[in-house]
Amino acid sequence: MRVKKGDTVVVIAGKDKGKKGSVLKVYPKTSKVLVEGVNVITKHQKPSAMNQQGGIINKEAPIHISNVMPFDPETGKGVRVRYEVKDGNKVRVSAKSGKEL
């Protein structure tokens, strides 16, 4: 997976196309990511021991990884990622600007 937790990504497809946010969680088995402020759903929460009140809450739902691209602040757009070996370590690099992500 070319997207990691904490990355800033831009949504390239779907109802939230064009929105930016940071990755909160990555689900490699299902190829999905949870992005802050993107794909917000309304959930009806039952009262429980943890949440006495219950009610309607808004929360982010995971979106497929093919619908996001890592954001490059150098170009201000979503970019493809390639890997390079620097000092024996594999690092992610923007394919356009060549800067490390």
Swiss-Prot record:
A single Gene Ontology CC term: ribonucleoprotein complex
Keywords, sorted A to Z: Ribonucleoprotein, Ribosomal protein, RNA-binding, rRNA-binding
GO MF annotations, alphabetized: rRNA binding; structural constituent of ribosome
SMART domains found in the cross-reference section: KOW
Function as written in the Swiss-Prot or TrEMBL entry: One of two assembly initiator proteins, it binds directly to the 5'-end of the 23S rRNA, where it nucleates assembly of the 50S subunit.
Family: Belongs to the universal ribosomal protein uL24 family.
Pfam families in alphabetical order: KOW (PF00467), ribosomal_L24 (PF17136)
Protein name: Large ribosomal subunit protein uL24
Subunit architecture: Part of the 50S ribosomal subunit.
The gene coding this protein: rplX
UniProt source species: Clostridioides difficile (strain 630) (Peptoclostridium difficile)
UniProt key word RNA-binding: yes
